[in-house]
Amino acid sequence: MSKPAVVIDNGSGRCKTGIAGEDCPKAVFPAVIGKPKQKGIMVGTGQKDEYVGDAAMARRGVLIIKYPLEHGIVTNWDDMEKIWSHAFYSELRVDPQEHPVLLTEAPLNPKANRERMTQIMFESFNIPAFYVAIQAVLSLYASGRTSGIVLDSGDGVTHTVPIYEGYSLPHAVLRIDLAGRDLTGWMAKLLMQRGYSFTTSAELEIVRDVKQQLCFVAEDYEKELANASSNSSLEKEYELPDGQVITVEAERFQCPEALFKPELLGIEMDGMHLTAFNSIMKTDIDIRKDLYSNIVMSGGTTMFAGIASRVQKEIETLAPPSMKIKVIAPPERQYSVWIGGSILSSLSTFQQMWVSKTEYDEMGPSVVHRKCF
């Protein structure tokens, strides 16, 4: 392998991509495909049938915005291929035939999803070698630990993966399909109760921005709620693209609260703190202490202010009183999956782990289950 690997952190919301060995992704773009709602009539203005990534976001007012990945699972393979092709040719400007590729995936994904990824990479892009890594494991690499439990929450999936001395504990891996995109939908609902309506795919992108700019996690939800009704110190204004100003108040912490109380969305699931706790309880009694003291947060949905101290507080309530609990939230955590991939694929000991083109030709797509864990 003469050329360095290309690392693609295949998120449901944003695709992070770059060259192995670098310390941050070279390009981060929305994992979206935009298709025009109406027919183009002005000749020569160079309209296209579809736009990818930032180009789609820039023209979102006239496009239908679609995400090919939902809850970490690819729902439209043709669109997914366009996103990868955009990553290789437009963002990184590399020829995929010359570089091994490391892709990331959420744990407990259907096996067929992984096989199809492998097939497209080898057959459409003709890459020399391939590997699929679990997102949370890479985040642990990036944090420089070999033991810990990773609480990763992105746009499509929230999952907890306990790892001890470098071994993953697959029986204790848990996943909830509640993450950033669900929070955006919930925020749109909360804003609707205030009298602001956001319905189209482009308007939901505005809601996502409101969520990212203004939301925070309350340390004590009930107290914050009582506080919000009595004074208006929480009020913040947000200017929409057309110049109107909307005001948000209690919505700022009601939105991310759904991570801890999925019943707000009418979903029967455990919140993220309980999922992490259950994950720890599924592991062997001897290693729980190490996991409690190394709870590593990663992913874009863990970027809310106040989330680390809230997770700490919630887990302290659940765990035995004498247990020391430490939540680690690195500042670069929205890219830590990519950073971990960059570290992993540039290790000399990793080079024998790649699935090579020859192996793929001999065994077909199922080879990926044998070599990638």
Swiss-Prot record:
InterPro entries (alphabetical): Actin (IPR004000), Actin/actin-like_CS (IPR020902), Actin_CS (IPR004001), ATPase_NBD (IPR043129)
EC numbers: 3.6.4.-
Alphabetical list of Pfam families matching this protein: Actin
A GO term from the CC aspect: cytoskeleton
GO molecular function, one term: ATP binding
Keywords from the UniProt entry: ATP-binding, Cytoplasm, Cytoskeleton, Hydrolase, Nucleotide-binding
Domain of life: Eukaryota
Catalytic activity, reaction form: ATP + H2O = ADP + phosphate + H(+)
Localization terms from the record: Cytoplasm, Cytoskeleton
Family as reported in the entry's similarity comment: Belongs to the actin family.
Function according to Swiss-Prot or TrEMBL: Actins are highly conserved proteins that are involved in various types of cell motility and are ubiquitously expressed in all eukaryotic cells.
PANTHER family found in the cross-reference section: ACTIN (PTHR11937)
Protein name in UniProt: Actin
